[in-house]
Design a protein with these regions (language model features):
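A short, structured surface patch at a secondary-structure boundary
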Residues: 321-384, 423-427, 431
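C-terminal terminal-structure detector
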Residues: 376-453
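A hydrophobic, helix-centered structural microdomain
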Residues: 247-311, 348, 417, 423-453
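N-terminal hydrophobic signal-anchor/signal peptide
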Residues: 1-20, 125-267, 438-453
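Membrane-cytosol interface motif
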Residues: 81-85, 137-153, 284-307
Length: 453
């Protein structure tokens, strides 16, 4: 099957999904909300409202990876379809509110969401099975560097669940016998040095073999290079993180507006949480901890206290080991599970210590330990620390530090307000994913312990 036909079939399947999920919204609009707007629409206006939902669902479906049939389980697809539909419904509810003279009844919208989840579930089940029946797993080879091994890629990250891994080899072994790739459809290159990688890449391109590259730090930095021409030669200009002033202005404006609105809306949660923490052990409500932000500047990050007052009485900084950490109070377990402990950082954002999106701030002593193992770790301090970030959305709490660093540097290499919004919306999804709050081994001072990166 040609690549064109493959992509065409996938687009048709995704389009069918968007149509199916739009049907419950259209019914809800025509049967209820359309009759209650300030000035009832004629047919074209009704079509426009339905089309707006259709477009929103496609946009948020891409943000939440709701269409990735080949890379996810059916349950994951349904979960992400739910969020794409829910966010689209919420935006449309605001639009309908603006079109009406009063706050519209939300129950028809909830009923539409239930219908959308049913439609999405039917689609996900059938599309997932149809995809793997039409496009069975391809013969795949994993070529790796000794330092980073292929075990993580295949086992920890689940490559073998979606690809038919028929061959593994080091870069040296592959280069000595490139014919081993004959008959292979897909190649994964994991942590390979540029010289070896280029030899393998050239062979794969010449033989129409699809290649996925797990980048090294240098690759990530180069990905943000500015393309230009000098002296009649193509050039790539690479430098320190230095985004356009317009980007920084809009980013700071969004930080102020969003954090201020969020503090007002979430004030009841702040009050209830403060009372619960105080009533548990009569200790302080907030916990202030020194963290690092842009250019290694130190600041005091605020959190609701989730651990005992004497959690670090020995003076040693430790990362949490998750649910098994006996330093966490009963209230702390609840607010950590709901991410409520992070909410006071909205004050840090309003003050300008942090941004909504950026690399998560580390404690100085833990950052120093990371830098001993990975000197490149300091590169993430080019940008202001954030409440959420690329690594938080696309990784897990216990994703290896090297991979988290690569994700953070990928974000830094491509500053974009659009990307910031994508990360903000994607953060909503991970709030309800338990695995994103998993801890590390008990007693570890950093996630580097025992890690061969």
């Amino acid at each position: 099957m040609t690549r064109f036909r493959h992509d065409l079939i996938l687009r048709m399947i995704k389009l069918l999904d968007a149509v199916l999920v739009t049907i419950p919204f259209a019914m809800c609009w025509y049967l209820y909300y359309a009759k209650r707007v300030a000035s009832p629409y004629y047919a074209k206006g009704d079509y426009l409202v339905v089309a707006l939902f259709f477009v929103l669902f496609i946009i948020f479906g891409r943000v939440y990876d709701a269409f990735l049939m080949s890379m996810q389980r059916i349950s994951e697809i349904i979960y992400e379809q739910f969020f794409a539909a829910a966010v689209s419904d919420f935006i449309m509810y605001i639009v309908i509110w603006l079109l009406s003279k009063h706050l519209p009844n939300i129950l028809p919208g909830v009923a539409a969401l239930v219908g959308q989840v049913i439609m999405a579930s039917i689609w996900a089940y059938n599309a997932h099975h149809a995809y793997f029946k039409t496009f069975p797993p391809q013969a795949t080879a994993v070529i790796y560097d000794i330092r980073r091994g292929m075990e993580q890629l295949i086992g920890k990250y689940g490559l073998d669940a979606k690809y038919k891994v028929v061959s593994t080899a080091t870069a040296g072994e592959c280069i000595e016998n490139l014919s081993m790739l004959d008959g292979i459809n897909t190649v994964f290159l994991s942590g390979i040095h540029s010289h070896d990688r280029n030899i393998i890449l050239k062979y794969c391109v010449e033989n129409n073999i699809t290649v996925f590259v797990v980048p090294r730090i240098g690759d990530t930095i180069m990905s943000g290079a500015h393309h230009m021409h000098m002296f009649h030669l193509p050039m790539l200009r690479v430098g320190r993180y230095n985004p356009q002033p317009e980007y920084l202005f809009v980013k700071r404006l969004l930080d102020i507006v969003i954090s201020a609105i969020a503090l007002v809306i979430l004030s009841p949660i702040f009050l209830v949480t403060a009372i619960a923490i105080k009533a548990t052990d009569h200790g302080p409500v907030f916990y202030k901890q020194i963290r690092l932000t842009k250019d290694s500047k130190e600041f005091g990050t605020l959190k609701f206290r989730s651990m005992r007052v004497d959690a670090e009485k020995d003076g040693v900084a430790r990362l949490s080991s998750g649910e098994n950490d006996d330093r966490i109070t009963p209230v702390g377990k609840i607010i950590r599970a709901c991410r409520v402990d992070e909410l006071p950082q909205l004050i840090n954002i309003l003050k300008g210590d942090m941004s909504i999106v950026g690399p998560r701030p580390e404690r100085p002593e833990i950052a120093a330990q990371y830098c001993e193992e990975m000197p490149e770790f300091s590169l993430r301090l080019q940008a202001k620390a954030g409440l959420t970030g690329y690594a938080q959305v696309y990784g897990k709490y216990n994703t290896t530090p090297y991979d988290k660093l690569t994700m953070d540097l990928m974000y830094i290499a491509h500053p974009s307000i659009v990307e910031d919004f994508k990360i903000m919306f994607a953060t909503v999804k991970i709030l309800f994913m338990p695995e994103s709050t998993e801890g590390i081994s008990e007693g570890q001072t950093t996630a580097m312990s025992g890690e061969n990166h």
